[in-house]
Amino acid sequence: MAIKKIGISARCDRPEIIGKVREILAHFSSRVQIFVATPTAEVLGMEGTPVERMREEGVELIISVGGDGTVLRNIAKMKDPLPILGINMGTLGFLVDVEPEDALETIEEVLYGFSYSDRMRVDVFLNGEMLETATNEIAIMSAKPAKIIQFEVYVGDCLLDSMRADGVVFATPTGSTAYAMSAGGPIISPRVNAIVVVPVAPFKLSSRPWVIPSDSEITIRLSAPKKEAVIAIDGQKSYRIKLDDVVKLKKSRFPARFVRISDTCFYERVQRKLT
């Protein structure tokens, strides 16, 4: 086989997902070395390896068993993400291409060699300190429910817009089918290097979604005193910001990597998921 070492990481709170992991381990453990992520291994009663250490162990790809959230959590643990193959045990699943009944056959094919697509990510900085890297989106929302915030968005040195809104979403092409789409933003092909800026329930009708080049440096500042906001990164981690804070977004040097499945067409897949 071309692939010698793989990793596997799963959502651990659903028995059917753990059952699928056991099935994968039983089928492939004698043919390829499998490193099981620590939380998953604890449920299985075996020795585990942190996802963030799998690259140094020589792992060539990670099988993520769960939904989109599981994929995002796995990617977030790695500075330079390994290729991910997602097994869809969730609901909609834009980041998980393989259905449970096809898992063994697909993994069998992938073990003989695979290609992957790079997906841009965005580094998030607060007052010059890097917080996280987003694969899907950065959402900035009011810290208090049902309250609007006022903020300015700059692209480079140019003011893009001064907004009063419930918030704003900055999405990668990968994240354009998530929160940004629900807020009225466009769907962007992952082959396009761009960042989508989508106001959430803006006060003025002239505040519209924008698509800007991925190499742009974006700056966000709150402009109303005594109001705080929250930055949510991929729906996983959040940070509070206040009036004098400066948020900057920059394209990351380290993309996410998704294993290509031969019969996968982005446009057909999106249409299928949305119907």
Curated annotation (Swiss-Prot):
A Pfam family annotated for this UniProt entry = NAD_kinase
Top-level EC class, please? Answer: transferase
**Binding locations of NAD(+):** 68-69, 73, 136-137, 147, 164, 166, 177-182, 201, 236
Q: Which residues form a coiled coil?
A: none
Give me the reactions it catalyses: NAD(+) + ATP = ADP + NADP(+) + H(+)
List required co-factors. a divalent metal cation
Q: Which residues form the active site?
A: 68 (proton acceptor)
Q: Superkingdom, according to UniProt?
A: Archaea
What is the protein name given in its UniProt record?
NAD kinase
Q: Which organism is it from?
A: Methanosarcina barkeri (strain Fusaro / DSM 804)
